[in-house]
């Protein structure tokens, strides 16, 4: 698949980039995508949730009413889960949500996500650029020139560039990552994928198998 390379003014440079069909042109595997996104989101969880159970609630252990003869239901102490202020039954406890996923499944998922973008003509290639200073206004202008400003976009750089990153950080609909940070969730969470000319080669090198 060949794509035209644009400059930051949105003009066609006349150069072409050929995307590797083994990465951008495979038959997408939805189940692999599901597993990779599930793992990514699970790994983001802190898992620090905690609620007190019956034995942890502060309160008297005195039996509220006698066992028999009162005419009502049996009742223990004030920490009972059926009473307001009592402990919670089977409440959440701190835990680690991370789980293992095979490298081949991850690779297949990311190739599938990239293939979906290529299939939907949602990939734009821009020549390598940098900025003199972090300017959000300039980043918006570049996005408008490339006709990707209206919807969520993900820009992939070959390596870290703080000037570009800081320029986009304050934008709700824009994200900037490096090619080595590329993941299935980030690709699918964006409507348009903007690759710099050099990042295409880095992405293909990372997924070469």
Curated annotation (Swiss-Prot):
GO terms for cellular component: ribonucleoprotein complex; ribosome. Residues 44-77 are annotated as: Disordered. GO terms for molecular function: rRNA binding; structural constituent of ribosome. Keywords: Ribonucleoprotein, Ribosomal protein, RNA-binding, rRNA-binding. GO terms for biological process: translation. Gene3D superfamilies: 3.40.1370.10. The keyword rRNA-binding applies. Part of the 50S ribosomal subunit. Belongs to the universal ribosomal protein uL4 family. One of the primary rRNA binding proteins, this protein initially binds near the 5'-end of the 23S rRNA. It is important during the early stages of 50S assembly. It makes multiple contacts with different domains of the 23S rRNA in the assembled 50S subunit and ribosome. Forms part of the polypeptide exit tunnel. NCBIfam families: rplD_bact. This is Large ribosomal subunit protein uL4. It comes from Parabacteroides distasonis (strain ATCC 8503 / DSM 20701 / CIP 104284 / JCM 5825 / NCTC 11152).
